């Protein structure tokens, strides 16, 4: 004979894996061409000079230099640029 009444099943108990998004290289850091600067969903940050954008909106350096974050334009967009050294 069971000493405890059977518990019902739950519909919870699952969660998606973290995607490791965010800024990978901060302002003033030196980077090499091809380095990932930001992983993002959508264009939270836009590509400035010497920065390319992948099909998943990842920003990467296209030249060696230092990372620079700036806000500009009428819409106050955030841009990431690489200042060549």
Swiss-Prot record:
Question: What are the coiled-coil residue ranges?
Answer: none
Q: Which GO terms describe its cellular component?
A: cytosolic large ribosomal subunit
Keywords linked to the UniProt accession: Ribonucleoprotein, Ribosomal protein
GO terms (BP aspect): translation
Q: Which family does it belong to?
A: Belongs to the bacterial ribosomal protein bL27 family.
Return the protein name: Large ribosomal subunit protein bL27
InterPro entries noted in UniProt: Ribosomal_bL27, Ribosomal_bL27_CS
Q: Which Pfam families match?
A: Ribosomal_L27
As recorded in Swiss-Prot or TrEMBL, the protein's gene is named rpmA
PROSITE patterns referenced in this protein's UniProt entry, alphabetically: RIBOSOMAL_L27 (PS00831)
Keyword Methyltransferase belongs to the record: no
Q: Which organism is it from?
A: Glaesserella parasuis serovar 5 (strain SH0165) (Haemophilus parasuis)
The segments labelled Disordered in the record are: 1-20
Is Metal-binding set as a keyword in this record? no
Q: Name one GO molecular function term.
A: structural constituent of ribosome
């Amino acid at each position: 004979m069971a000493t405890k009444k059977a518990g019902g099943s739950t519909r919870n108990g699952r969660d998606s894996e973290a995607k490791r998004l965010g800024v990978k290289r901060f302002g003033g850091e030196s980077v090499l061409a091809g380095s990932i600067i930001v992983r993002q969903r959508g264009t939270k940050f836009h590509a400035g000079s010497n920065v390319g954008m992948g099909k998943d909106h990842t920003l990467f350096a296209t030249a060696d230099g230092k990372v620079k974050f700036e806000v500009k334009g009428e819409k106050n967009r955030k841009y990431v640029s690489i200042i060549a050294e």
